[in-house]
Amino acid sequence: MTTEVLASRQTKARDIERDAHISAWSPLALAERARLPDSLIRLGIRRLCAERLRTERGGNLESAWERFRTVLGDLGTSSIAIETEAANAQHYELPPRFFELCLGHRLKYSSCFWDETTADLDAAEERMLCLYAERAQLADGQHILELGCGWGSLTLWMAERYPHSRITAVSNSRPQREFIEARCRDRGFANVRVITEDINRLQLSSTQFDRVVSIEMFEHVRNYEHLLLRIADWLRPGGKLFVHIFCHRELMYPFETDGKDDWMGKYFFTGGLMPAADTLLHFQRDLNIEEQWRLSGTHYEKTANAWLVNQDRH
């Protein structure tokens, strides 16, 4: 599920090393070489997810709560985000052409919105972007900060929809900044500024933004309290933060890199966190949550399946 609240791969050499005991003919190796059909890959994914859920739900209610509290405590001693260079290598510094072939027209690299009236991926992207604007209470003339702007789906949508707004977009990826800036030049948008910076080092002037929006970036964050303190400083009086984050209904856990089956943590989401739906409710010292919405995980399922169709087509 996801929740919303208002308040060719470039890698390092170590990233492509595989555990010595993993055979070239293991299921993981075969999947990486596209030698397995999607049906078998899905079966393996379901098995790994089921194993993780059994581990996280093991024991009684008290032990599950203690695990949750331990993760909460670890977040408070971490830097804002970890393994930011790995995230770039795994996702954000791939050539934009790959994403143009896989994603929709807006290049939205996050969940889209589907219902019985949604015709296709392009329409699903548009539906979710409109939903963000409604729930974040965006309006023309605002100064808006987007943290983790990706390939510019929301940034460019806002620039088009709100020509009198000033939009500051932040990404840790140079290719993403260059891509968005090129799109702005092509479309004549003069109201967008793109900053390339690691979120740990991002420095901005106080009390300048009416809105801060962040779409599926908080999953890369560990120290929510520290980041929310900074965001509170960047917001003007009366300003609001809107966050879209994928999550589990009840469980919170980091993606580890120490097991032979931890493919996701090692090669796709290093340093990432699976937050629980109520995680941000535990971090309201500097910003108070006014509203929270939950969306079914089927929206992401349909989005990912549409990406897969595009990828297979090309």
Each predicted region: which residue ranges?
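A short acidic, Gly/Pro-enriched loop at the edge of an enzyme's catalytic core
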Residues: 200-212
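Conserved SAM-binding loop of SAM-dependent methyltransferases across substrates and taxa
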Residues: 151-163
